[in-house]
Regions:
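N-terminal signal-anchor module of multipass membrane proteins
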Residues: 2-105, 112-124
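Juxtamembrane interface elements at the cytosolic ends of transmembrane helices
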Residues: 18-19, 56-60, 64, 203-213, ...
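Membrane-embedded helical hairpins/re-entrant loop segments and their flanking transmembrane helices
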Residues: 38, 64-102, 271-343
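Hydrophobic transmembrane alpha-helices of multi-pass solute/ion transporters
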Residues: 4-5, 26, 31-35, 206-209, ...
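Membrane-embedded alpha-helical modules
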Residues: 122-241, 348-463
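Hydrophobic, membrane-embedded alpha-helices of multi-pass small-molecule transporters
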Residues: 39-56, 192-204, 222, 236-237, ...
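Intrinsically disordered, low-complexity non-transmembrane regions of multi-pass membrane transporters
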Residues: 1-44, 242-257, 292-296, 306, ...
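Short, non-helical or kinked segments that cap or interrupt transmembrane helices
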Residues: 76, 98-113, 155-163, 218-224, ...
Length: 483
């Protein structure tokens, strides 16, 4: 078997605040720490922004009208969300002290908080937004304090759990791509039209063709090129909207406390704290997935830093009129597909997000990409995440019946919110924050069943089906599974 390349891991070679580096520098810089030439850095970063843009602006588009904001105020929320997503992404990728995973990890507005935020602020106007922001600040600070303890969950993520969760992340995202392919707005007259679906299919074929025909850097930005070509084709078809450019302001700094000082209500704080715990669970799973994809397995310190960046970014976000931030799983698929592992590329994407938040007219250019075009590319992106999970499960000893049963039950439970969205409609609304997340429920089921089948009542063995190959260290487990 060929020798594994040895990289100099800058993240671990840099002295930590509490002592010497954990590992000695290797022969050459790890791809995660490589910097690309400026043009490649910019275009690769722009590709990440294009992949996440719709996901960032969608929550404010939903919450703004629900709480009674005007279209102009909702547009202001969208710009603020781009700005704060950029700040959170820079915290995550570049980091400082023990904050930041220092992985190619994109942060943006969390969808998990949309339903609770609508419930908190419905028809309350500026007061509703102020209460939402106050709840996010308190919940985020609580998450920041809990991060050093929450990261201990990594020990409960051997390959059978990790692979299951990564697969669920990809499968859970695919309905988003399907919705985009149909047009994104279920109430629109052309939702699900043959035109929209055909455009999605054309974009999908273009992306796959570019990946097959191109080489080198052009192959790495096949998604971006596919989005550009798809958008150009969509113009004569008539599904590209230029209205956003005409109405956009040239400059739009997100003035702090634009909607007034944050207000603090106990019920709202409890609700958003639950959302924060859900986001932290999903971010932990995302970091484990990304760590495997980029060949830098996420250990407890990495996850602690990542969770601190998530929660700090979320605490800062309301100051600039943004919402709770968390990892964007769709960008993990982009890393898996392009093989561009540099965290500085994603940091460049964070810089672009900040620029878009400050220059609304530039943001409106990105918004030109029709959702059907984005949906066609999304099928490949999100499918790549699921494929990475399946690859991880290949090293999880599924021939041992307990592990196959764990995967079957966890995937089955995790797919409930996707296959039957109203399945939990009779449950209390506070529980729906957790139950409506297939990633969270599937993750919990996988962890509990792994403990029940592979640990309780058994003597610890390094090669047990549910334990990590090579011991109970999940990082070593993923290394063994990968080779």
């Amino acid at each position: 078997m060929a020798a594994t390349p040895r990289f100099r891991d800058d993240a671990s070679a840099t002295p930590h605040p509490d002592g010497a580096p954990e590992t000695a520098p290797s022969d050459r810089k790890h791809p995660v720490d490589e910097t690309l030439p400026p043009l490649k850095m910019f275009t690769s970063g722009l590709q990440h922004v294009a992949a996440m843009y719709a996901g960032v602006v969608a929550p404010p588009m939903i919450v703004g009208p629900a709480v009674g904001l005007t279209p102009k105020e909702t547009a202001f929320l969208m710009g603020a969300s781009l700005f704060t997503a950029g700040i959170a992404t820079l915290l995550q990728t570049l980091g400082f002290w023990r904050i930041g995973a220092r992985l190619p990890f994109v942060n943006g507005v969390s969808f998990a908080g949309v339903t609770p935020m609508v419930a908190i602020g419905k028809d309350r106007g500026h007061d509703g937004i102020a209460v939402i922001f106050g709840a996010i600040i308190v919940a985020s600070l609580l998450g920041f304090v809990l991060a050093p303890y929450f990261c201990k969950l990594v020990r409960f993520f051997p390959p059978v759990v990790t692979g299951t969760v990564i697969t669920l992340i990809g499968v859970s995202l695919l309905p988003v791509a399907f919705n985009w392919s149909q047009g994104g707005n279920a109430t629109a007259h052309d939702y699900g039209s043959t035109t929209n679906i055909t455009m999605a299919a054309v974009t999908l074929v273009i992306v796959l063709g570019l990946r097959k025909l191109l080489r080198g850097f052009l192959q790495q930005i096949a998604i971006l090129l596919g989005l550009i070509i798809g958008t150009l084709i969509a113009i004569p078809v008539g599904i590209t909207d230029f209205g956003a450019i005409k109405n956009a302001d040239a400059i739009g700094f997100p003035t702090p406390f634009h909607f007034g000082a944050p207000q603090f209500e106990i019920a709202a704080i409890v609700s958003m704290s639950i959302v924060m715990l859900v986001c932290m669970t999903e971010s932990t799973a995302d970091m484990l997935a990304l760590g495997k994809i980029v060949d830098r397995p996420a250990d407890e310190r990495t996850i602690e830093g990542g969770l601190r960046a998530d929660t700090l970014g979320s605490a800062i976000s309301p100051l600039f009129n943004g919402f709770m931030c968390s990892a964007f799983a769709q960008n993990i698929g982009l890393v898996a597909m392009t093989k561009v592992r540099s965290r500085f590329v994603v940091a460049a994407g964070g810089g672009i997000l900040i620029l878009l938040g400050l220059v609304p007219v530039a943001a409106s250019v990105i918004a030109l990409v029709p959702l059907p075009v984005l949906g066609g590319a999304g099928i490949v992106l999100f499918g790549s995440v699921a494929a990475s999970g399946i690859q991880t499960l290949a090293g999880a000893a599924l021939e041992k019946g307990e592990n196959a049963l764990i995967v079957a039950a966890a995937v089955g439970v995790g797919l409930i919110p996707i296959a039957a969205p109203d399945f939990y409609h009779a449950f209390p609304k506070d529980l729906l924050v957790v139950l409506d997340s297939g990633i969270s429920t599937g993750c919990v089921v996988a962890i509990v069943l792994n403990l029940a089948f592979n640990h309780l009542g058994r003597k610890p063995e390094s090669e047990e089906a549910g334990t990590a190959p090579g011991g109970h260290d999940p990082v070593k487990a993923m290394e063994v599974a990968a080779h």
